[in-house]
Amino acid sequence: MTPAQCQARLDAGHVTFVFAPPVSEGKCAIPLPVRLRSLAIGADEIQFTGEPTLDCRLAERLADWIGNVVEPLARHHLGSGLAAIETGPGYVCRNRNNEVAGKLSEHAKGNALDIAAFALRDGRRVAVRPADQLAPAEATFLAAARATACGYFLTVLGPGSDAAHAEHLHVDLGLHGRTTNYRICE
């Protein structure tokens, strides 16, 4: 993808962003990184509080999922639209689960994002936590958002997947297996 193609796709998705310098740190690299700032939905804007640095393709997919699925789910289940998505930085040069050895994390390619919470327009904040730690409507909203993420991303991990993902929702576009045709949705 060229910078012009990235610009056109994110502009079409009503994404406010800036191009970041290409990343190259040893095995870690993002040839076309962007920093996400916000997503416009009609007259409203949803802020990305961490301004994560991501590969353009992930930024496009994320904006599509949030705008077309997560925002309507929040209105339906919680009675309020989204004001912000609280995220991690996106890009981090590290191995999976911060292990000393092992496979490179999708974060190291700008191909993954961790979502810690959803801030609502009415001032509430829905943190990603196990369902038994949430109000029923919040648990239903997070379960629906997580289930729909499995149709947009190739890996979706969150509370109950493992200890490393107990307090955030991890989404990425990492390819899996020899044929690269399956998803991990836990």
Model-found features: residue ranges?
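Catalytic cores and adjacent binding grooves of peptidoglycan-active enzymes
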Residues: 37, 71, 104-186
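Conserved aromatic-histidine-acidic binding/catalytic patches
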Residues: 54, 58, 103, 137
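Beta-hairpin (beta-strand-turn-beta-strand) motif
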Residues: 41, 88-90, 118
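Short intrinsically disordered, low-complexity coil segments enriched in acidic
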Residues: 1-4, 180-182
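Active-site-adjacent substructure of cysteine-protease-like catalytic cores
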Residues: 76-110
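Active-site acidic/histidine clusters and adjacent loop/turn architecture
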Residues: 2-86
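Short, solvent-exposed polar/charged micro-motifs at secondary-structure junctions
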Residues: 28-32, 93-98, 168-170
